[in-house]
């Protein structure tokens, strides 16, 4: 395991392991539109889309003013936090994953928001393109990919 992962990246790793156990495929640091970058987007077997924001502490959470914008790209929205995080400060109408670098568990299921069909199609295509281009970039590091901090940006 790389030693230079941030606390948030370690939480994302654990959250992804948890979601894979629930039948999801995950992409980290995905940019659904300029100015937004979700920590984890997960695609389920039935096409459901979950977004997970990883928070390493109270200050990390209270300084995040963009998270409500992620609701437009998810059927369910979760926070991933460690065992010491004060869960009572998280909005009650969101999901909760308790995670560490080894895995996680869903402590509170998020309510279902249900994306509109056109948005679902665009988000799913953006997810697929991001995953495919990242995989291609790993096998061909010299390949120029689309711009964006995470490899690609899509705007459904």
What are these regions (language model features)?
Residues 2-4, 9-34, 89-156:
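Non-catalytic C-terminal interaction segments of nucleic acid-processing enzymes
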Residues 1, 51-52:
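A short, structure-level motif marking secondary-structure boundaries and short turns
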Residues 13, 56-100:
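Catalytic cores of nucleic-acid endonucleases
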Residues 34, 38-51:
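Active-site beta-strand-loop-beta-strand hairpin of nuclease catalytic cores
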Residues 19-20, 44-45, 71-73:
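Flexible, charged surface loops at secondary-structure boundaries
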Residues 29-31, 53-60:
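Short, flexible loop segments at the rims of nucleotide/cofactor-binding pockets, characterized by
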Residues 22-24, 48, 75:
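Short coil/turn segments at beta-strand junctions that form active-site/ligand-binding loops
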């Amino acid at each position: 395991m790389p030693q230079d992962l941030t606390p948030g990246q370690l939480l994302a790793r654990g959250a992804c392991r948890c979601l894979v156990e629930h039948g999801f495929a995950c992409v980290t640091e995905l940019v659904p539109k300029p100015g937004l970058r979700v920590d984890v987007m997960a695609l389920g077997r039935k096409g459901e889309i979950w977004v997970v924001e990883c928070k390493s502490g109270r200050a990390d959470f209270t300084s995040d003013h963009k998270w409500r914008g992620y609701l437009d790209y998810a059927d369910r929205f979760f926070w991933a936090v460690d065992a010491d995080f004060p869960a009572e400060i998280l909005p009650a109408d969101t999901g909760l994953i308790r995670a560490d670098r080894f895995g996680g568990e869903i402590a509170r299921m998020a309510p279902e928001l249900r994306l509109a069909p056109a948005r679902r199609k665009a988000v799913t295509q953006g997810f697929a393109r991001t995953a495919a281009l990242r995989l291609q970039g790993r096998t061909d590091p010299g390949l120029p990919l689309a711009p964006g901090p995470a490899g690609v940006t899509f705007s459904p």
